[in-house]
Amino acid sequence: MERIKELRDLMSQSRTREILTKTTVDHMAIIKKYTSGRQEKNPALRMKWMMAMKYPITADKRIMEMIPERNEQGQTLWSKTNDAGSDRVMVSPLAVTWWNRNGPTTSTVHYPKVYKTYFEKVERLKHGTFGPVHFRNQVKIRRRVDINPGHADLSAKEAQDVIMEVVFPNEVGARILTSESQLTITKEKKEELQDCKIAPLMVAYMLERELVRKTRFLPVAGGTSSVYIEVLHLTQGTCWEQMYTPGGEVRNDDVDQSLIVAARNIVRRATVSADPLASLLEMCHSTQIGGVRMVDILRQNPTEEQAVDICKAAMGLRISSSFSFGGFTFKRTSGSSVKREEEVLTGNLQTLKIRVHEGYEEFTMVGRRATAILRKATRRLIQLIVSGRDEQSIAEAIIVAMVFSQEDCMIKAVRGDLNFVNRANQRLNPMHQLLRHFQKDAKVLFQNWGIEPIDNVMGMIGILPDMTPSTEMSLRGVRVSKMGVDEYSSTERVVVSIDRFLRVRDQRGNVLLSPEEVSETQGTEKLTITYSSSMMWEINGPESVLVNTYQWIIRNWETVKIQWSQDPTVLYNKMEFEPFQSLVPKAARGQYSGFVRTLFQQMRDVLGTFDTVQIIKLLPFAAAPPEQSRMQFSSLTVNVRGSGMRILVRGNSPVFNYNKATKRLTVLGKDAGALTEDPDEGTAGVESAVLRGFLILGKEDKRYGPALSINELSNLAKGEKANVLIGQGDVVLVMKRKRDSSILTDSQTATKRIRMAIN
């Protein structure tokens, strides 16, 4: 204050003002400060001062040929005097205006391609709708969000290689483009940017925006996908929010969303199979999302969600070190604990074995709709500060924290028996048993917890057992806060291990994730998810199982038919026929299977009864363990569309319809593919007689040497294989029979098999 008063007094004297405005600045320190180094010390001032001059710009001498000395208004555009210290010309700002209006034009075709992300953003904003502004307290929590809509998911290194290859193809330096996405993008961009005149550095910068995910740790209340984040400054302030619907979606958000849907479906399906881990890996490797292999997306995409992280762990990728319980992400912020098994009694006198965490610990809990800070000691909740969007969300967080605290009053609040099971009908572990129990009904838990009077603390209020707010009393240790708790900001990833039952543990053996933590929410994916694994056929119901099973047989008919004739047992045990069994009425499975297998054996034995369409139609029924009975069927029942529908053993039906003219198969009216061969068997050729005593195995196999003529076959030993040239120059693989007794049927089946092998 003293200094300011002193300055005011000085300024009131006219002499002071004169000194400050009129005298030259010749103090060495000041001159040094403003002239040393290349860095401009006061850019704004410099700009104003420069632009006040007549010719603030310097340009190359060639400009004198390209721009007139005066414009239409007669104003001078450049000065004949050289710029001091260089051979450049001094130019007026008016010259820029002249150039922009009358200068040479260039092709603009590359601009939308290079500045694609900007053009797309403008489109999204143009078509977006802004709703009303609401004034209310904003509970924002910092989350790691994607700030760059419309990007691919390349790593920085991968993107760098692509950019170098596209923008500076002749530069030296090893560039390895390995991933499919790298190659596709490089090819596409090279074509798009042919003869592009935009500065290479600018192109490189813009390409980086398109290829790499950029994330920031920002305070958000509401949507976290990148199309919302790009308008964050327009949609939420400290005390207001504006409703907004984006005017378009971007692929990266769709990939994130679809990845979560696919991962959840896969984890749920794997849980119920005999070997969950093997099944999960098989499904991840055979699934595509929007035409890209799921495993490639998992390697590149940083989305953190329980199911996604389980898939990543299975692939041996690192994941975040936080753990999940009750749908909340827990991160320990201080303290430590040791684990010890302890037996406890529920209110129903059921014994539970729980792993007790002994020691003082603090955690942040972050969920989709609520966040909290939890301080706990051994089997005791010390303090829980919750914030959430609504009463329901806050209650969810409180239940999870109370169960996690392992307090005795929580365990004693259990009424009835705990016998929750997972999808595979296995009992859940005790902690999840308790969680499920109270998620169904927490009344007793809240009533038994106890309440306490509270102090008036800014921004905090109490919450009563019926979940209503109060300023006087609150559940013991629990407070509701206006402020959210930030998500864990670190992006560090740790090495984890996963067991057969998909439980993910860190190096110290703490369970971070398990299938119980995977949300049951059924979302609809934005991008097409193609599950090639037969394990996922049932995801869209019985009809899809039926169609997929027949499509699979037709797609693999080449190998299927050879197995059908040589090794039917291997064929019947294929996992692709498993989902189909759930469609066949339980009581009939064994009888149908026995019937079909007998029928197939007759086809193998008797001339002219081989019928491709019939084999395809009945094959899935033969996969069940057969019952030996003399039962004959004219139709087989499958349960689809809520009732039993019939497949006719001979002839077409609405379920299975083969059109001879088009050679296409429709299953329940859906196209299931085309048969590439002619199912009508013709007359036996001469080869069948000659090939007596040989078994036709299928197409030519180069490992067995060059093709022999039919006459040379007599030299083969029993069980020996060879390629043979038959008929119209076709080559098939045969094996000399080990037993003579079966020679009779050879000539009958040979024709059919030759036909099959050639086709």
Swiss-Prot record:
Swiss-Prot/TrEMBL GO biological process terms: 7-methylguanosine mRNA capping; cap snatching; DNA-templated transcription; symbiont-mediated suppression of host gene expression; symbiont-mediated suppression of host mRNA transcription via inhibition of RNA polymerase II activity; viral RNA genome replication
Record's subcellular location: Virion; Host nucleus
Recorded superkingdom: Viruses
GO CC, alphabetical: host cell nucleus; virion component
One MF term in the entry's GO annotations: RNA binding
Chain ranges for the short sequence motif Nuclear localization signal as given in the UniProt record: 736-739
Annotated site residues (Avian adaptation) in this chain: E627
Any Pfam family: Flu_PB2_7th
Keywords: Cap snatching, Eukaryotic host gene expression shutoff by virus, Eukaryotic host transcription shutoff by virus, Host gene expression shutoff by virus, Host nucleus, Host-virus interaction, Inhibition of host RNA polymerase II by virus, mRNA capping, mRNA processing, Viral transcription, Virion
Coiled coil: none
Subunit structure: Influenza RNA polymerase is composed of three subunits: PB1, PB2 and PA. Interacts (via N-terminus) with PB1 (via C-terminus). Interacts with nucleoprotein NP (via N-terminus).
Role according to the record: Plays an essential role in transcription initiation and cap-stealing mechanism, in which cellular capped pre-mRNAs are used to generate primers for viral transcription. Recognizes and binds the 7-methylguanosine-containing cap of the target pre-RNA which is subsequently cleaved after 10-13 nucleotides by the viral protein PA. Plays a role in the initiation of the viral genome replication and modulates the activity of the ribonucleoprotein (RNP) complex.
Family (UniProt): Belongs to the influenza viruses PB2 family.
Full protein name: Polymerase basic protein 2
Organism (species): Influenza A virus (strain A/Duck/England/1/1956 H11N6)
Taxonomy of the source species: Viruses, Riboviria, Orthornavirae, Negarnaviricota, Polyploviricotina
